[in-house]
Amino acid sequence: MQPGLRIPLTADPQLFREAVQLGRRVIWLHTYGERFSTPKEGRPKGPPRLPKDSAPRIPAKGVISDSPDAMPETITYDLAQQRLSIGDGYVERVPPAVWNYEVSGKQVLRQWFSYRQKDRERPVMGDRRPPSKLEEVQANHWLAEYTTDLIDLLNVLGLLVELEPQQADLLQRVCAGPLLSITELNEAHALELPAASLPKKQGKGEQSLFAED
């Protein structure tokens, strides 16, 4: 049985501040620059970008065709060339760690492509409701916005990969240092919800969302 998630909380103020800063950058990346954007700290507003000399690029010969006849059906990766192929097109400068990047055990790029490829049908498993007819309403060719989305995603994944050594180092230092216990957090009332976040009590004359019979 897999143990539950455990989050070590450092009692070292400096390490805590470092973790906060790192967390802000992760959220900035996950939200494509919409949250925690602070230009002076290297987090400008808008889609995050890798340095030009290492950012993914699509050369003239790698442009993904927008012809219905060339709608991509496959996504593949060439390790030697660090090239990501989408149908007949391709993107250069894609590191192996970006191609293999997973979230919850699923390869991000394969998942992303599965919702944009020519055949998007998925098998009905168990008692799950059959797919809606609305799922058949889709473009019959590769859209320019798909390419933009792909470049944005590759940049974000690349920047997340770059953070991994820093995250691992910080975690090691946090675990090796003093930690806050659940007892200390409770004694400091750190786990209590502030009154403003609690649901308001129902006043007289107000109807409940769920009416009683």
For every predicted segment, state its role.
Residues 2-213:
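Sequence-level detector for compositionally biased, low-complexity segments
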